[in-house]
Amino acid sequence: MSTVRKITLKSSDGENFEIDEAVALESQTIKHMIEDDCTDNGIPLPNVTSKILSKVIEYCKRHVEAAEKSETTADAAAATTTTTVASGSSDEDLKTWDSEFIKVDQGTLFDLILAANYLNIKGLLDLTCQTVADMIKGKTPEEIRKTFNIKNDFTPEEEEEVRRENQWAFE
């Protein structure tokens, strides 16, 4: 029986999180720190608060568990003569879980994007950015400004010039 190596992550507000190495390896940034043997006193993450780090860890744990589950299912299917399509249902379960996970307030969503980018977690970055893209899709510039609380700093003349230059986007 092998022991699971633990990695300590330190949030910007001083909280420590001890997680399995497999979960930590979901982050390319942390993976490189582990490879460079920079984990002795924990890995400081100055750009990630404990609130956001706990959400990131939750996401990574779930995705590691899902990957392990689908590997086990694939191994079991390969061992039997009849193959089943059980991995399809776990993919659907994960998509459902992701869609529930990402139902957060705007501030948290943007902090998750920043953390996913900093930690280089492609799946989480894709999920969060797609969520923002879906929030924008089909909206006018005014609606987008209202959604994201963006102040319009264009003069009417500048706005008209942008509309002319990007006519294709307004059709």
Curated annotation (Swiss-Prot):
Expressed in tips, cortical layer and epidermis of roots. Detected in whole seedling, vascular tissues, pith and vascular bundle of young stem, leaves, inflorescence meristem, young floral buds and organ primordia, flowers, developing seeds and through the valve of siliques. Expressed in male meiocytes, pollen, embryo and endosperm. SMART domains: Skp1. One of its GO terms (biological process) is response to jasmonic acid. Its main location: nucleus. Pathway: Protein modification; protein ubiquitination. It comes from the Eukaryota. Disulfide bonds: none annotated. GO terms for cellular component: cytosol; nucleus; plastid; SCF ubiquitin ligase complex. Residues 113-171 are annotated as: Interaction with the F-box domain of F-box proteins. Keywords: Auxin signaling pathway, Chromosome partition, Developmental protein, Ethylene signaling pathway, Host-virus interaction, Nucleus, Ubl conjugation pathway. InterPro entries: SKP1, SKP1-like, SKP1-like_dim_sf, SKP1/BTB/POZ_sf, Skp1_comp_dimer, Skp1_comp_POZ. It is found in: Nucleus. Involved in ubiquitination and subsequent proteasomal degradation of target proteins. Together with CUL1, RBX1 and a F-box protein, it forms a SCF E3 ubiquitin ligase complex. The functional specificity of this complex depends on the type of F-box protein. In the SCF complex, it serves as an adapter that links the F-box protein to CUL1. SCF(UFO) is required for vegetative and floral organ development as well as for male gametogenesis. SCF(TIR1) is involved in auxin signaling pathway. SCF(COI1) regulates responses to jasmonates. Part of a SCF E3 ubiquitin ligase complex composed of SKP1, CUL1, RBX1 (RBX1A or RBX1B) and F-box proteins. Interacts with SKIP1, SKIP2, SKIP3, SKIP4, SKIP6, FIB1/SKIP7, PP2A13/SKIP9, SKIP11, PP2B11/SKIP12, PP2A14/SKIP13, SKIP14, SKIP15/FBX3, SKIP16, SKIP17, FBW2/SKIP18, SKIP19/FBL20, SKIP20, PP2B1/SKIP21, SKIP22, SKIP24, SKIP27, SKIP31, SKIP32, SKIP34, ADO1/ZTL, ADO2/LKP2, ADO3/FKF1, AFR, COI1, EBF1, EBF2, EID1, ORE9, PP2A13, PP2B10, TIR1, UFO, SKP2A, CPR1/CPR30, NUP58, At1g55000, At1g67340, At1g78100, At3g04660, At3g61590, At4g38940 and At5g49610. Belongs to the SKP1 family. This is SKP1-like protein 1B. It comes from Arabidopsis thaliana (Mouse-ear cress).
